[in-house]
A protein has these predicted regions:
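Long amphipathic alpha-helical coiled-coil segments
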Residues: 85-95, 124-157
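Short, charge-rich amphipathic alpha-helices with coiled-coil/heptad character
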Residues: 37-71
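Glycine- and charge-rich intrinsically disordered segments
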Residues: 1-30, 167
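Acidic, low-complexity, intrinsically disordered peripheral segments
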Residues: 158-167
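Generic structural signal for well-ordered, non-membrane alpha-helices
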Residues: 40-43, 71, 78, 85, ...
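Extended, amphipathic alpha-helical coiled-coil scaffold segments used for oligomerization/tethering
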Residues: 81-128
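Non-transmembrane, amphipathic alpha-helical segments
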Residues: 26, 30, 61, 65-68, ...
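Short, well-structured hydrophobic secondary-structure segments
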Residues: 57-94
Length: 167
């Protein structure tokens, strides 16, 4: 798999997740670095569309990159599922704690829900980061597909401009 999507070993990931105060910041840094690296990678692939010899090589590169991103996306979705499981467990625990042990009586379920969300703000923020990054990865796949389809158009344009047939 590409170095861009090096997510670390399972132990490294678990270690990162246990460091709560620094965990979200590390996640933000990890996501931001992946975004920056992919921005550079997409620009490099776009630049390869400028010349025909590079365009021919580009097709093979694009297929490999798409597979890397799809594999990464699948891994990321698995992590999101684990995070959602953790969220649901914690939400249930918070709900039970408020309903059974709280000294405060909440007038509505909406008030209870707001209190739970306030108590779980860190986990909600982490889920939001995961969701935003998943959307970014999906858009990256679409961009790579767009470049792949641009290859054919680039070759056709070159044929029109030069009158040369490529085989």
């Amino acid at each position: 798999m590409s170095d861009i999507f090096n997510m670390g070993s399972a132990t490294q990931v678990e270690q990162q997740q246990t460091e709560k105060a620094q965990g979200v910041k590390s996640l933000e840094d990890h996501i931001n670095s992946i975004h920056l690296q992919w921005n550079k990678e997409i620009q490099k692939l776009n630049d390869m569309l400028k010349t025909i010899p590079d365009t021919i090589e580009l097709e093979n590169i694009i297929f490999a990159k798409i597979q890397d991103v799809v594999d990464y996306y699948h891994t990321w979705l698995n992590r999101m599922a684990a995070l959602n499981h953790k969220y649901n467990q914690r939400y249930a625990a918070e709900y039970n704690n408020i309903k059974m042990n709280a000294q405060i009586r909440y007038s509505t379920e909406a008030a209870v829900r707001m209190q739970i969300e306030a108590n779980m703000a860190d986990l909600i923020y982490e889920r939001d980061l995961y969701n935003q990054h998943a959307e970014y990865v999906k858009e990256t796949i679409d961009t790579l597909d767009g470049i792949r389809f641009a290859i054919k158009n680039r070759i056709e344009l070159e044929k029109l401009m030069t009158g040369v047939e490529f085989k």
